[in-house]
Amino acid sequence: MYLIKKLIGGAIGLTAAVGMATAVFAADISGAGATFPFPIYAKWASAYKGVSGNGLNYQSIGSGGGIKQIESKTVTFGASDMPLSVAELNRYGLLQFPTVIGGVVPVVNVRGVAPGAMTLDGATLADIYIGKISKWNDPTIKKLNPSVNLPDQVITTVHRSDGSGTTFIFTNYLSKVSPEWKSRVAFATAVDWPVGIGAKGNEGVAGNVAQTAGSIGFVEYAYAKQNNLAYTKMANRDGKVVSPVAAAFGAAAAGATWDPANGFGTLLTDQPGADTWPIAGATFVLVYKQPQDQAATREALKFFQWAYRTGDQMAAGLDYVPFPDAVKQRIIGSWTQVQGWNGS
């Protein structure tokens, strides 16, 4: 079993075997979906339990699963890194709002390559996942990394096998930087991968990369950091080489408007700016405007209200980017559309 380092000593940890589908933490508010925000939702949940006595049962099953579960009304809230369209939200009577911003990072298992030692760009990353670049000492990779000793080793690509918002962010980026990727594969929570092996969840991808020599995968940055995986730097839209740090993830949102009229559905991939990480995204929560269980939905919103007010430092500690106070107030203000929400 591949152990993901405990986020909170003696409290909530993440464990995953390769292919393991679900990570769960205990108790009273029910949610399901994206694995991208699971580390921060777990940390918030532990702290919130301590101050309120209320727990959170969140199934980290992927964005596709979260959307299905909220649509089937089996959980109080769904979670997705792919924002739903206004038409989709209206069809199901859902309200959507973002919680934090994070970064999707390529991670590699290449002999002698330390975290941050390798640089890739979007076109090269797309060609690796298409299968056009199949060895680590390919001239294209060597040109980006003249001082790195790259082995004559076959590249094994690892991707998500489940419906995944992380996949949506990653493939949306590749579609913007590679015309061939856009025409052959496109972007969605699940795509027909040209090459490679699949794994469930960010946890599963991290585990596969750690165990497979010569591999490359993509995970939310907290998973790379917690598992000591060798992440790459990226050349961004402005041609600048940037490291995956919170400031770079936040820079991707510099021009975002975060409009409640479209469910705050802003994409942050391939944004301009010298300091911008190119594969960034927000993660979203979905609740019903007219919930069957108003009390449960009210408790879920109280949890996120508490997180907005007191959880920024915890989010920053895991390299997520909290929203500015003005945006948080706009988000909380949108909750008046939820029947039974009384503001606290």
Where are these regions (language model features)?
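C-terminal segment of classical bacterial N-terminal signal peptides
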Residues: 14-25
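Assembly/oligomerization scaffold segments
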Residues: 2-4, 20, 79-80
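Bacterial N-terminal signal peptides that target proteins for export
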Residues: 1-12
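Flexible loop/hinge segments at secondary-structure junctions
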Residues: 25-344
